[in-house]
Amino acid sequence: MNGAQVIIQEINREAEQKIKYILDEARKEAEKIKEEARKRGESRAEWILRKAKTQAELEKQRIIATARLEVRRKKLSLQEEYISRVLKEVTSRLSNLSEDEYLETVLALLKEALKELDVKEIRVHSNEKTLALISSRIEEIRRELGDVSIEIGSPIQTIGGVIVETKDGNMRVDNTFEARMARLESELRSKIAEILFG
């Protein structure tokens, strides 16, 4: 049984107890009035009992509605907490890829940017670690990318990935991990929520 069901059951139990108490008090009051009003008729007692039942039902509905809102709020809070954890874990894993895995990722990001920019001369910006990796394996990267001139740009603050721009700086593609995560965040959140919460 999950936490939300436990909360709903507890609130339903409390609501039933409160309703029972209200009805018991109403019955006692009705019996008292019936005794006093036998000569005058029982219509007032019945009216009080009907009113008490109506009040009890309204109270029950109010308690249940409040409980449902609370359960929904807690579920959304829990969902957001789990989604944040997963996104942090993804970010952590991306920043801890092995050199070969990371180079493969950088190549894919460079290819994607080249396709979008449709140029043969680019400048690449990233963190110092990534720029050093690109510099040390530049020939391998050029073979993979084809006839492309690659200039190493200035270092930027990022956990990984690259910003690729034309030599004149007029066009750029931000393929840093942060930018890609931001672009995909709503889709990622939707998928993570579906996996975690069905």
From Swiss-Prot:
This is A-type ATP synthase subunit E. It comes from Pyrococcus furiosus (strain ATCC 43587 / DSM 3638 / JCM 8422 / Vc1). The lineage of its organism: Archaea, Methanobacteriati, Methanobacteriota, Thermococci, Thermococcales. GO terms for cellular component: plasma membrane; proton-transporting two-sector ATPase complex, catalytic domain. GO terms for molecular function: ATP binding; proton-transporting ATP synthase activity, rotational mechanism; proton-transporting ATPase activity, rotational mechanism. Component of the A-type ATP synthase that produces ATP from ADP in the presence of a proton gradient across the membrane. GO terms for biological process: proton motive force-driven plasma membrane ATP synthesis. InterPro entries: ATP_synth_B-like_membr_sf (IPR028987), ATPase_E_C (IPR038495), ATPase_V1_Esu (IPR002842). Has multiple subunits with at least A(3), B(3), C, D, E, F, H, I and proteolipid K(x).
